[in-house]
Structures are given as structure tokens and as C-alpha cells.
Amino acid sequence: MSKKLTFQEIILTLQQFWNDQGCMLMQAYDNEKGAGTMSPYTFLRAIGPEPWNAAYVEPSRRPADGRYGENPNRLYQHHQFQVVMKPSPSNIQELYLQSLELLGINPLEHDIRFVEDNWENPSTGSAGLGWEVWLDGMEITQFTYFQQVGGLPTHPVTAEVTYGLERLASYIQEVDSVYDIEWADGVKYGEIFTHPEYEHSKYSFEVSDQDLLLGNFERFEAEAKRCLDEHLVHPAYDYVLKCSHTFNLLDARGAVSVTERAGYIARIRNLARVVAKTFVAERKRLGYPLLDAETREKLLAEEGE
């Protein structure tokens, strides 16, 4: 590799590449979440018959993974570059390899392996066939073909490509610690994120108010249900995300037992399933506006509209 791309240049390169493949460039969703998959730009749009092609960077918070800014590879918050394409292009893996070449990684010169790793997210009732992508022995990407999202079967199938930006940048820049990654010319990752990592880790493991969080979970769950009673899908899903993040904080604090943990996950999953069903029903009521006219008329006729 000749020029070592900065973190932001990696993002810009991926944005331009997937824009050229027909993806809309979305912005990060303004609610805490554990993965780019949980953004409504993936979770909601992966279900139903309408096409959807989008790419976006998603900061992803995982309180239990925080290490006070001291571990070179474990983070409270990391960044994913998320690509979702529905229906899935037949050449999606080839497109992915092309994107690596633009980042200076020639597939012919490196050991790139697709290692089977079927994916499941119990808290959202989602699952799919998947592969981890290993670059010279290090996982850099997760490939998933969704089979179920929010408890609903996906048709057409959505392909998801999730790049781990910190890992990818560490490899490209040949550094052993994420904190040594060059975010922009002259600015290191650690200069931006070391202190927030320390503070969020301290909060997650030592300072968070368990009683407050337990009460918040109950209130967020109730508000999600109230929104769903009013058929307000997007506000309801916002509260599902808040429930998920609140649970993750409780889990990191050790505030829930193994039995309670399963119960909390089931409660989040049940909400997510109702959100998914309500969203699809709403899109149908609107006449599936993202479908072309011929397909829309045929589908609505088949569904008895």
C-alpha cells in the first residue's frame, strides 16, 4: 500500500464507492444503539417488499466492552460502516472486494477469507446467513443475508455489509492500537476518544444509577407501547432503542441476573416485533410507495387491496 488513508478518508472512499453502486448516503441515527443493524435505516427497511439501498457510518455503543481507554482494541463506542441493499445484488461479494481495492488492499496479495458465521440478534428477533471476512487473520467485516427481521421473514432478501472501521483503519495504517489511528492529518484517534472512553467506562461500570436505569426501562417500554397504540412506528422504535441501551447499561453494571437478563431481552424483542409488523402494515396502507407502479399494482392486487 502506498498512501495510508486516514480514518476519515476511509469513510469518504467507502461513501463514494457505495454511492456509485446506487446507495443513498444516510447519516448516523441520533439514538444510542449497539450496532448499525439497529438503525431504522436497516431494521425497518429490511422488511417489506420495497427496495432499499443505503450506506452510512454508525457509532455503536456497547457499555460492557468499555475498557477505560486502556485496551488497544476494546471500546465502549466503535464505528461501523453499514451497507444495506435490497434486493441483494448477485455480485455483492465482488463489489465488497472492489471496495477493499480502493482502500489499497489488493485481494490477490492478501489472505481474504469468508468464514461462515450465521448472525442472530435475539433482542430484535432478527437472524440471517452470514460470514465474517478475515483479512490476513483479522476480522474486518460481517456479511449477512437477512432471513428474519423483527420476527418477520424478509422478502426480497436484504444483504448487509458491516465494516469495522477501527479494525480496518488499524490494518491499513499498520498500527497496533486504535488510539494510534490517524483520524485526520495530524490528529490521532486517541486525541479525540481516549477521554470519552474512560468516562463512559467509569459511568457504565461504577457510577450509573441502577434504580434510575431500572425505572427508565419501565418508562421507555410503556411509552413504546403507547406510541404503538397510536400507530406511531418511528417514535415507538426510538423507545425500543432506548430500552435496548438502558438494558445494556444495566447489564454492564451487573444489575440483572441471568434469569432477569433473558426476561429483559424478551421484552425488547416483543416490542421490536410489534414495531416491525406495524411498519409493514403502514407501508402497505400507503401503497408501498418505493415500488415501481407495475410491481406495486400486482402486489396490492395479490394482497387483496
UniProtKB/Swiss-Prot annotation:
Keywords: Aminoacyl-tRNA synthetase, ATP-binding, Cytoplasm, Ligase, Nucleotide-binding, Protein biosynthesis. Its EC number is 6.1.1.14. This is Glycine--tRNA ligase alpha subunit. One of its GO terms (biological process) is glycyl-tRNA aminoacylation. It is an enzyme of class 6 (ligase). It catalyses: tRNA(Gly) + glycine + ATP = glycyl-tRNA(Gly) + AMP + diphosphate. It holds the Pfam family tRNA-synt_2e. One of its GO terms (molecular function) is transferase activity. Tetramer of two alpha and two beta subunits. It is found in: Cytoplasm. GO terms for cellular component: cytosol. The keyword ATP-binding applies.
